[in-house]
Amino acid sequence: MSRDIERNFFPDNKNNFRHIREDEIIASYLKHKNTRKAKLVVYTCITNDYDDLSNMPTHYYAHKDADYVCFTDNETHIKSGQVGIWQIRPLEYTRGDSTRNNRWHKTHPHVLFPEYEESIYIDSNINILSDYLFKVIKQTGSPLVLPKHPKNICIYSEYKDVTSAKLDSLELIIQERKILEDSGMPENYGFCENNVLFRKHHDANIKNMMDEWWNMITNYSKRDQLSLVYILWKNGILPQNITFENTRFLINDFYVFGHQKGR
């Protein structure tokens, strides 16, 4: 039976609506999947039922030449092995809290996917509506591509926001900020939102940066946005050269839902 419900409607440029049947997308994708071997994997990670994959069994634009993988600790999904276009895999890392377990998967595509050349991590509350992301990745030509932050252009502004909202341990935030300041991290260097991450994950520099990033997340704030731009700066990478417009502003290309749970 076709999934014909309200979330299948999104505005287009003419303020009309488009209707896409999820079951048709899934069937078409799975049929083509059996005819090829993918070099690209699109993946997400859901811990502690932070989001419900049953609500998004496919992106409305499912790239026919990419595999889709979801890591989760949801036993029902693990037993099923497949939800829509998503191949279900159990978590590979469970030694941290639910947030850091997610972050490990986010930062370790080189460990998780040795058989793929490229990967796109995407938060589980984002639905890809068009081929825009795949085009911008090709046009950018960088081994790392991600969105701009919707508000901040300075990492220190993000530290203030996270502190004010009490989103993590104040002690860890202060310790991490001091590392940046002592290292000479400049203000207004540029800033990213890490809800979509394309990587050529076997690139040596990318692997080293991901290891550095994970080290910061492990030892300091679990808020990964507080450390990635610092890693980019240390490696001489300008955010403006590897970013595209924030997903929330690209309403014809992405739909960003609220998370099922706060983290």
Could you say what each language-model-derived stretch is?
Residues 1-102, 112-116, 219-222, 234-237, ...:
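N-terminal anchoring/stem segment of glycosyltransferases
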Residues 39, 65, 121, 193-196:
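Extracellular structured ligand-interaction cores
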Residues 42, 68, 110, 125, ...:
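A residue-level signal for conserved active-site and pocket-lining positions in enzyme catalytic cores
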Residues 43-46, 71-73, 122-124, 130-131, ...:
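Short His-Asn-centered micro-motif
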Residues 47-50, 75-77, 93-96, 126-128, ...:
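Short, solvent-exposed loop/turn segments at secondary-structure junctions
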Residues 53, 69-103, 130-141, 157-187, ...:
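Core catalytic alpha/beta fold that binds nucleotide/phospho-ligands
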Residues 108-164:
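GT-A fold catalytic core of metal-dependent nucleotide-sugar glycosyltransferases
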Residues 167-263:
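Catalytic core and acceptor-binding pocket of nucleotide-sugar-dependent glycosyltransferases
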